[in-house]
Amino acid sequence: MMDVGEPMSQLLGRGIRGCALFVALLVAGPLAAQQVVHVGGAFFPPYVVKAEHSQHAGLLPQLLDALNRAQSDFRFIVRPTSIPRRYQDFEAGRIDMSMFENPAWGWQEIAHSVVDMGLEDAEVFVARAEPGRGQGYFKRLRGKRLALFNGYHYGFADFNAEPQFLAKNFDATLTYSHDSNLLMVLHGRADIALATRSYVSDFLESHRQYAGQLLISRRVDQRYRHQVLLRPAAPISAAQLGRLFEQLRRTGQLAAIFAPYRIAVRSGAADSSVTAGVSD
């Protein structure tokens, strides 16, 4: 019942506050209903750049933006991690998924489900271009100084990423910078570096002064058929995520993001991407 003695200004104030609260609830409702999906951001250029900082760059943020715009049930956000720490973060539930992965990269004993992203890249060998040097230079790695990224799993080493193994069996220098590895090759401090084809393409686009100075192998160390690994308790299921990737592929959004980096978008890959998880 209205208090007849209550000033009109107070009544108006109540009404305004009530309307504001109603509008706020209307706006917040859809956001509150969204389930947050934490995606691990481990340094893997050009996919993830500056993952240890609050501002993320690279292709992963572009992909998550496209996923967020494609639906309203989930909100995908990057949570920083690192190459070695991502396993622990995944098992602890700090991250719900890890993208641009391969189950052979140390995930064999960790429960997960797999979604094929429908994207393909390749790890290639890179040397300094010199007169008379051709593709035969990449046939043998023994006796050559290698510049590798610490923590990465390489095919030529049977995916053994242990620094001691690489140092003992290969003349390998391990760093945390792909730029440094390529510069070591360019300046004669290493004979061969390994990097993704997409990264080498991006490096040469950003450092045009090195055009023609690198010899890139036709030999491929490994082909990346990029996959998403989902933890069992993730807010989104493998089937739901697979349908979202198929939607982005069908509408051309995957190609718009990845094709400029020479990352192939495989036709129809997401239709059959959902597979059973690996158990402990």
Task: Identify the meaning behind each predicted range.
Residues 28-29:
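N-terminal signal peptide c-region/cleavage motif recognized by signal peptidases
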Residues 78-141, 153-156, 218-219:
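Acidic, polar ligand-binding/catalytic clefts
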Residues 74-75, 153-170, 245-280:
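Ligand-binding clefts/hinges and TM-proximal coupling segments of bilobed small-molecule sensing domains
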Residues 41-45, 120-124, 209-245, 265-279:
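Periplasmic-binding protein-like
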Residues 64-72, 116, 142, 150-175, ...:
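Ligand-binding cleft/hinge of the Venus flytrap
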Residues 70, 84-95, 178-199:
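Short helices/loops that flank or line small-molecule/ion binding pockets
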Residues 61-71, 131-132, 138-145, 152, ...:
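Extended ligand-binding regions for polar small-molecule ligands
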Residues 34-110, 174, 251, 260-261, ...:
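Extracytoplasmic small-molecule ligand-binding "clamshell" domains
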